[in-house]
Amino acid sequence: AIAAVITFLILFTIFGNALVILAVLTSRSLRAPQNLFLVSLAAADILVATLIIPFSLANELLGYWYFRRTWCEVYLALDVLFCTSSIVHLCAISLDRYWAVSRALQYNSKRTPRRIKCVILTVWLIAAAISLPPLIYKGDQGPQPRGRPQCKLNQEAWYILSSSIGSFFAPCLIMILVYLRIYLIAKRSNRRGPRAKGAPREGEPKQPHPLPAGPSALANSPTLASSLAVTGEANGHSEPPGEKERETPEDPGTLTLPPSWPVLPNSGQGQKEGVCGASPEEEEECGSPAVPASPALACSPPLQQPKGSRVLATLRGQVLLGRGVGTAGGQWWRRRAQLTREKRFTFVLAVVIGVFVLCWFPFFFSYSLGAICPQHCKVPHGLF
């Protein structure tokens, strides 16, 4: 029964982590640099499932080390290497999450694939530095006990304490502190709410930001009110008395573009003047007899529309909306959505890391007791 369960876990680990690697490498939405951590972590878990767990299962079922002594030493070194790499990967991911939340602008510009690969290489070097000493320095090895051979971890106190601190306790402490800090940052940002600087209040409609009324004012004037003229008098035109009384009332918040706005060339007819009504035919094309406005306002000339902008038609003309309608609010909401995704991902990782720590803590705690008090703190073999 134990062999069947462990075999299922081995296959499930290999299949699940292979899907993670395949998804990150093939999906465009998952090709963010930080997802390289997941690829490397999944590779470490696959190596554990293929090179470590099967031999551990055989050792437990047989009760002795069936394979060669040399492979035992390599097996123990690889065991420490892959397990330490997995834990340190989780520590690196937690630090990446923290910097992405606390220093979003500065860190996201530096989060390049090359930097992430350098961090991953550092993770593997740390794991190698912890796992290789038993292969290089074997210490004073007494005679092998008679009977069936055993394959056990290094029992020297200096290695037990150093490997336990480097492989588990130090990364675990870092992860707990980092995720506590991320929680405090998320809580503080939720208290601030949407009333951040430059952000629209809840229930307040987003107002479009029309562009100024002339090419020279596009780069200098921030609002439409400073550059648009609401009546024809802004261009030197006057309306006959009584014309204003016959005009159809409009939304006071709607502004029109003056006739001085440059027009687009008509196909095959050259550039028109900025004043409408040069001929009866043109008046019929762009004007409407239902709204008897002055010649300057009877119809608005075609807009020279910048790329990405939109035109809003009104009774008294056309309003050119800016390229980013509600740019400040839109940026704020995009930033808020990004932070929400960061927090959700951080929460998922915190759950995964919490379960991981609970699974590893009993082993490292009992393993460390053998170095602290080898005579009085012996852990039962079955529990270990």
From Swiss-Prot:
<dbReference type="InterPro" id="IPR017452">
    <property type="entry name" value="GPCR_Rhodpsn_7TM"/>
</dbReference>
<feature type="compositionally biased region" description="Polar residues">
    <location>
        <begin position="218"/>
        <end position="229"/>
    </location>
</feature>
<dbReference type="GO" id="GO:0051379">
    <property type="term" value="F:epinephrine binding"/>
</dbReference>
<feature type="transmembrane region" description="Helical; Name=6">
    <location>
        <begin position="349"/>
        <end position="372"/>
    </location>
</feature>
<feature type="transmembrane region" description="Helical; Name=3">
    <location>
        <begin position="73"/>
        <end position="95"/>
    </location>
</feature>
<feature type="transmembrane region" description="Helical; Name=7">
    <location>
        <begin position="382"/>
        <end position="384"/>
    </location>
</feature>
<dbReference type="GO" id="GO:0005886">
    <property type="term" value="C:plasma membrane"/>
</dbReference>
<keyword id="KW-1015">Disulfide bond</keyword>
<comment type="function">
    <text>Alpha-2 adrenergic receptors mediate the catecholamine-induced inhibition of adenylate cyclase through the action of G proteins.</text>
</comment>
<feature type="site" description="Implicated in catechol agonist binding">
    <location>
        <position position="167"/>
    </location>
</feature>
<keyword id="KW-1133">Transmembrane helix</keyword>
<comment type="subunit">
    <text>Interacts with RAB26. Interacts with PPP1R9B. Interacts with GGA1, GGA2 and GGA3.</text>
</comment>
<keyword id="KW-0675">Receptor</keyword>
<dbReference type="GO" id="GO:0019229">
    <property type="term" value="P:regulation of vasoconstriction"/>
</dbReference>
<feature type="topological domain" description="Extracellular">
    <location>
        <begin position="141"/>
        <end position="156"/>
    </location>
</feature>
<keyword id="KW-0807">Transducer</keyword>
<feature type="compositionally biased region" description="Basic and acidic residues">
    <location>
        <begin position="240"/>
        <end position="249"/>
    </location>
</feature>
<keyword id="KW-0812">Transmembrane</keyword>
<comment type="similarity">
    <text>Belongs to the G-protein coupled receptor 1 family. Adrenergic receptor subfamily. ADRA2B sub-subfamily.</text>
</comment>
<feature type="topological domain" description="Cytoplasmic">
    <location>
        <begin position="26"/>
        <end position="36"/>
    </location>
</feature>
<dbReference type="GO" id="GO:0004938">
    <property type="term" value="F:alpha2-adrenergic receptor activity"/>
</dbReference>
<feature type="topological domain" description="Cytoplasmic">
    <location>
        <begin position="181"/>
        <end position="348"/>
    </location>
</feature>
<feature type="topological domain" description="Extracellular">
    <location>
        <begin position="373"/>
        <end position="381"/>
    </location>
</feature>
<keyword id="KW-0449">Lipoprotein</keyword>
<dbReference type="Pfam" id="PF00001">
    <property type="entry name" value="7tm_1"/>
</dbReference>
<feature type="site" description="Implicated in catechol agonist binding">
    <location>
        <position position="163"/>
    </location>
</feature>
<feature type="transmembrane region" description="Helical; Name=1">
    <location>
        <begin position="1"/>
        <end position="25"/>
    </location>
</feature>
<feature type="transmembrane region" description="Helical; Name=4">
    <location>
        <begin position="118"/>
        <end position="140"/>
    </location>
</feature>
<keyword id="KW-1003">Cell membrane</keyword>
<protein>
    <recommendedName>
        <fullName>Alpha-2B adrenergic receptor</fullName>
    </recommendedName>
</protein>
<feature type="transmembrane region" description="Helical; Name=5">
    <location>
        <begin position="157"/>
        <end position="180"/>
    </location>
</feature>
<dbReference type="InterPro" id="IPR000207">
    <property type="entry name" value="ADRA2B_rcpt"/>
</dbReference>
<feature type="region of interest" description="Disordered">
    <location>
        <begin position="192"/>
        <end position="289"/>
    </location>
</feature>
<dbReference type="InterPro" id="IPR000276">
    <property type="entry name" value="GPCR_Rhodpsn"/>
</dbReference>
<keyword id="KW-0297">G-protein coupled receptor</keyword>
<feature type="site" description="Implicated in ligand binding">
    <location>
        <position position="79"/>
    </location>
</feature>
<dbReference type="GO" id="GO:0006940">
    <property type="term" value="P:regulation of smooth muscle contraction"/>
</dbReference>
<feature type="topological domain" description="Cytoplasmic">
    <location>
        <begin position="96"/>
        <end position="117"/>
    </location>
</feature>
<feature type="transmembrane region" description="Helical; Name=2">
    <location>
        <begin position="37"/>
        <end position="62"/>
    </location>
</feature>
<keyword id="KW-0564">Palmitate</keyword>
<dbReference type="GO" id="GO:0009986">
    <property type="term" value="C:cell surface"/>
</dbReference>
<feature type="disulfide bond">
    <location>
        <begin position="72"/>
        <end position="151"/>
    </location>
</feature>
